C-alpha cells in the first residue's frame, strides 16, 4: 500500500509540474504576441488552452483519489491540499494568458501606441515570479517562496505606472484609445499572474512549514 501511495504522490507532483510548464509557456507566448505583434503566438496560446483545462480536471481527480483511498499523515495531507490550490491558480494563470493573447490579436490591428518600456519589465517580473514559485514547489524551498511574495508589490507598481501613462496617451489622442485600453488590460492580466504566483508561493510555505500566510496580505484569489 505504501509503495502505491508513493507512486500516486509522485505522479500527482509530476502532472502538476507539467501543468506549470504549460502555463509558463502560455504566458511567455502571450506576452511576446503583444510585444512582437505576433498573431501566430497568440493563436498558439488559444490552441493550447484546452490542455491546461484538461490537466486541471485530471489533477483534481487525482487529489480526490488520494484523499479517498489513503489515510494521510499531516505533511502529506498539507502537500495534497496545497497541490489542489496550486492547480486552481495554474488554471487561472492559463486564463490570464488567453486574455493577453486575445488582446494581442486586437492590438496588432492598430499602430503601436508608444515604445514598450514598462510592459516588458512587468512581464519579465511576472514570469520570474511564476518560475520561482514553481521552483519553490519542486525544492520545497520556503525562502524562495518568501522571495516571490516580496516581488508582488513591484508588479503592482509597474501596473500603476502603465495605467497612468496609457491614460495620459488616451486623453491626449483619441485615435489611440482602443489599443491603449487593450494594453491596460494586458497589464491587468500580468498583475493577476503575479497574484497567482504569489498564491502558489504562499501554498509552498503552508505545504512545507504548516503556516497559512494567505490572510496576512490582501486576498488575491
Model-predicted segments: where are they?
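Cytosolic, long alpha-helical scaffolding segments
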Residues: 1-221
Amino acid at each position: 500500500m505504501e509503495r502505491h501511495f508513493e507512486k500516486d504522490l509522485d505522479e500527482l507532483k509530476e502532472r502538476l509540474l507539467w501543468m506549470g510548464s504549460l502555463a509558463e509557456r502560455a504566458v511567455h507566448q502571450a506576452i511576446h504576441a503583444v510585444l512582437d505583434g505576433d498573431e501566430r503566438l497568440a493563436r498558439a496560446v488559444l490552441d493550447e488552452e484546452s490542455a491546461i483545462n484538461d490537466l486541471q480536471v485530471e489533477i483534481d481527480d487525482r487529489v480526490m483519489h488520494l484523499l479517498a483511498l489513503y489515510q494521510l499523515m499531516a505533511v502529506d495531507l498539507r502537500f495534497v491540499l496545497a497541490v489542489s490550490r496550486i492547480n486552481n491558480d495554474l488554471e487561472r494563470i492559463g486564463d490570464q494568458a488567453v486574455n493577453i493573447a486575445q488582446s494581442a490579436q486586437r492590438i496588432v490591428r492598430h499602430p503601436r501606441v508608444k515604445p514598450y518600456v514598462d510592459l516588458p519589465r512587468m512581464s519579465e517580473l511576472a514570469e520570474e515570479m511564476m518560475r520561482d514559485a514553481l521552483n519553490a514547489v519542486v525544492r520545497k524551498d520556503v525562502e524562495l517562496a518568501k522571495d516571490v511574495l516580496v516581488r508582488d508589490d513591484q508588479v503592482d507598481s509597474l501596473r500603476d505606472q502603465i495605467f497612468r501613462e496609457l491614460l495620459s496617451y488616451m486623453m491626449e489622442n483619441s485615435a489611440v484609445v482602443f489599443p491603449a485600453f487593450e494594453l491596460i488590460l494586458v497589464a491587468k492580466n500580468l498583475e493577476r499572474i503575479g497574484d497567482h504566483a504569489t498564491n502558489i508561493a504562499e501554498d509552498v510555505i503552508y505545504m512545507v512549514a504548516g503556516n497559512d500566510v494567505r490572510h496576512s496580505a490582501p486576498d488575491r484569489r
